[in-house]
A protein has these predicted regions:
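Beta-loop-alpha module in the N-terminal Rossmann-like domain of NAD(P)-dependent dehydrogenases
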Residues: 18, 48-111, 308
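Active-site loop of classical SDR/Rossmann-like NAD(P)-dependent oxidoreductases
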Residues: 36, 301-313
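Contiguous beta-strand/loop segments that form the cofactor/metal-binding neighborhood of enzyme cores
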Residues: 188-277, 310-325, 342
């Protein structure tokens, strides 16, 4: 069995959700981690069980002759680091969002094509038990056609969320606020259920409003004024006739459970957090929720993030071993989710609908 030499770039809060599932793969040798803060890298290296630490990711890739890197960095660094890693001959799995612009994302796709390597992007909630049940019921025709959809995300991001970070809260570094950082997974799931179509062909137009209502007088740790949206609502219209509404905000009093509702020909769907209930008009119903035994020890981090990071990482390495595209590839996300998220911002900033 080929052993992939793997490195972690970025040793912040999300890094255990990449390193520990990667380390658990029989085909992986987790050899090094990298962070501009060497002490942070050393601390994570102990948790991850890797012997080498670096402050320069290019040096790490070259010296360790890495096959794969996981990118766990601030949003604005996803693209430049992924592009360079691909150029150096590494396969790449990056955290969401793919990038903070279409130009950045296109550079990643071009680098992947030129290198012949594989690029994947984390959208782990598609692997949740509830998500898989809904997908199965839709694909089987049990629910018929979707007629309409809606979702909402009402979470809490206190001032400390921004004041403790030197990059969050700015368009240049975070790329947005409540949409790209908090609601992106829920909006993606809703659109995945509806169906993006090949290369996003089913997307018709979006019409969005964004605002900064509760964080506009806050500065982040670098002194930059928080100017990204903390609330957004709008319409995502599809060419198959489905109109989907969304609402998100990050100044609620607590992190409430996200919700997705689908109104279908033969029934309806309600997704609440990771649990899904499918109710058919003939009286039948189906449900799925996280199995208490279906857990993964990430060695730290919020337990409510569940085991789905590990499931997507399993798929990524299985695809590398088989020489196939991962289920959630960079090319797929570029043509669908990323294009849609960027359109939401284009509409929100301009105050006008944006056509695909």
């Amino acid at each position: 069995m080929k052993k992939f030499k793997v490195g972690i770039i970025g040793c912040g809060r999300i890094s255990p959700f990449h390193s520990m599932p990667a380390k658990a793969q029989e085909c992986v040798n987790l050899v090094a981690c990298c962070d501009v803060d060497i002490e942070k890298a050393k601390d994570r290296a102990k948790l991850f069980g890797c012997k080498k630490v670096y402050t320069d990711f290019e040096e790490m890739i070259k010296k360790e002759k890495l096959d794969v890197v996981h990118i766990c960095l601030p949003h604005y660094l996803h693209s430049p680091v992924a592009v360079r890693a691909l150029e150096l001959g590494c396969n790449v799995l990056t955290e969401k969002p793919m990038a903070i612009s279409m130009k950045q994302a296109k550079a990643m796709i071009d680098a992947e094509k030129k290198s012949g390597k594989t690029l994947g992007v984390i959208f782990q909630n598609r692997y949740n038990a509830g998500s898989q049940l809904v997908r199965k019921c839709l694909d089987s025709g049990l629910l018929g056609k979707i007629k309409a959809a809606k979702c909402n995300v009402t979470w809490c991001r206190k001032p400390e969320y921004y004041t403790s970070s030197n990059w969050k809260g700015t368009w240049d570094m975070e790329g947005g606020g409540a949409i790209i950082d908090q609601a992106i997974h829920t909006i993606d799931l809703m659109c995945w259920f509806i169906g993006y179509g090949k290369n996003g062909a089913n997307l018709d137009y979006v019409d969005v409003s964004i605002a900064n209502r509760a964080h506009h007088d806050i500065h982040n740790a670098s002194g930059a004024l928080v100017d990204v949206e903390d609330s957004a609502d709008g319409l995502i219209a599809f060419k198959n006739g489905v109109k989907a509404s969304f609402w998100c905000m990050n100044y609620y009093s607590f992190d409430d459970q996200v919700e997705i509702t689908l109104d279908c020909e033969y029934g309806n769907v309600k997704v609440t957090a990771e649990e899904a209930v499918v109710t058919l008009y003939d009286g039948r119903s189906f449900s799925a929720k996280p199995d208490p035994s279906d857990t993964f020890d990430y060695g730290g981090g919020p337990s409510y993030w569940g085991a789905s990071h590990a499931k997507q990482i399993d798929d990524f390495y299985a695809a590398l071993e088989d020489g196939e595209e991962p289920e959630i590839s960079g090319k797929l996300i570029y043509a669908t989710t990323h294009k849609m998220i960027m359109a939401l911002y284009d509409s929100g900033k301009s105050g006008k609908p944006v056509k695909f």
